[in-house]
Curated annotation (Swiss-Prot):
HAMAP family: Aden_phosphoribosyltr. GO terms for cellular component: cytoplasm. This is Adenine phosphoribosyltransferase. NCBIfam families: apt, PRK02304.1-3, PRK02304.1-5. The gene is apt. The lineage of its organism: Bacteria, Pseudomonadati, Pseudomonadota, Alphaproteobacteria, Hyphomicrobiales. CDD domains: PRTases_typeI (cd06223). Belongs to the purine/pyrimidine phosphoribosyltransferase family. It is found in: Cytoplasm. One of its GO terms (biological process) is purine ribonucleoside salvage.
């Protein structure tokens, strides 16, 4: 059994969720499987083990779970990137494009110091709109975005390619065809 197949087997697919035609890739089953979760975190961390990473930034909400584990393994701090209005202290904010509209995300203004080496983490990359916004937000406050890591890539939707075009190396552990 290959690494990709082994981890893929721990991801549940839910057809027609949240709307018809979508194949929702549910990582909660991977998170519930201790061996699969550990393996996924180890594989996301592996390229940067032994390198200086100051912070791991995780996008709401599953990026918090994965990002916290990655930060722990790298002995780095963790920074949540949240939807507008969810953080209690002074924030820096950016608007970003969604498939059908615009939203805003923010982080604490003092969460990252200029020049700090940051890895962006989330569970899945699809169109890349949210991840692109997060990279722009991190760079806006002076972060050196070393890489973006995702468990799942939906390559047909072009998100990983969008980040690579921004000179952000992308690490994914598996791909699924379609939406």
């Amino acid at each position: 059994m290959t690494f990709d197949h082994d981890l893929k087997a721990s991801v549940r697919t839910i057809p027609d969720y949240p709307k018809p035609g979508i194949m929702f890739r549910d990582i909660t089953t991977l998170l519930a499987d201790a061996r699969a979760f550990r393996r996924a975190v180890d594989e996301l961390v592996n390229p940067w083990a032994g390198n200086k990473i100051d912070k791991v930034a995780g996008m709401e909400a599953r990026g918090f779970i994965i990002g916290g584990a990655v930060a722990h393994q790298l002995s780095a701090g963790f920074v949540p990137i949240r939807k507008k209005g969810k953080l209690p202290h002074t924030t820096v904010r950016i608007a970003y494009s969604l498939e059908y509209g615009i939203d805003e995300m923010e982080m604490h203004v003092d969460a990252i110091q200029p020049g700090e080496r940051v890895i962006l983490v989330d569970d899945l990359i699809a169109t890349g709109g949210t991840a692109e916004g997060a990279v722009k937000l991190l760079r806006q406050i002076g972060a050196n975005v070393v890489a973006a890591c995702f468990i799942i890539d939906l390559p047909e939707l072009g998100g990983a390619a969008k980040l690579r075009a921004m000179d952000v190396p992308v690490r994914t552990l598996m791909t699924f065809e379609g939406h």
